[in-house]
Amino acid sequence: MHGTRLGTAVATLMLGAGLTLAGSATWATGPAGHPFQARQPDPSTHDALLVVEIPAGGSVKYEIGAEDGLLHVDRFVSMPVAYPANYGAMPGTRAGDGDPLDALVLTRVPVHPGALLRFRPLGVLRMRDAGQADEKIVGVPVDDVDPTYAGVRDLADLPSAERARIEAFFRVYKDLPEGSSAVTLHGWGDAAAARALIDDAIEAAGR
C-alpha cells in the first residue's frame, strides 16, 4: 500500500518536473522566437531595450546563444569581483565587432537572465578589449518599470560612486587568468553620445 502511494507520488513529481521543463523550453525557444529578434523602441522615446544575460551581483558570465537563443555558461569570472549592474545585449543592434551592443542597467534588485528590460540610456563607457572598441551603454529602468530613477536622466545625475564601481569592475575583471585580453578604459560619453551610438548600431543591424 505504502509502496503504491510512494510510486504514485514519485510519478506525479516526475510528471510535474517534465511539464516544468517543457514549459521552460517553450519559454526559451517558443513562439516568441530568439530574444535577439526583439525590436528596439522608437528612437523618439529615447528608451532602449536590453536582454539581460548576467544579473547584478553575478560572477558567472552567461551568454545567450546567437544561433539557439538559449542561455549558456560562457565562463566563471576568475577575479573576486561581481557585475555591478544587470549586463546583457541590446537586440536589434550591431556594434563594430559584429555583436549586439553591450549595456548595463542599474536596478534595486537583480533581474533574471533572459528578461527583456526597457531602460533609459544615461551614457556610455568607452572601452577597448584587445585593441578593439567595446563600448558599454549604461542606463536605468524607464519610469514605468521603476519610478525610483525618475530623476536620473543623464550621466551627470548618476552618483560618481556608481561610475567608479563600473570602471573598477571592467578595469580588473579580466586580470585573471593570465593571458586574457587586455582591457583599457577611455572615459565616458553622456546620454546624447550613448543615443548616437545606439542609433548607429540599429542602422548597422538593418543593413
Task: Walk through the language-model features, giving the residues of each.
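N-terminal secretory signal peptides that target proteins for export/translocation
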Residues: 1-4
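Bacterial N-terminal signal peptides
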Residues: 10-22
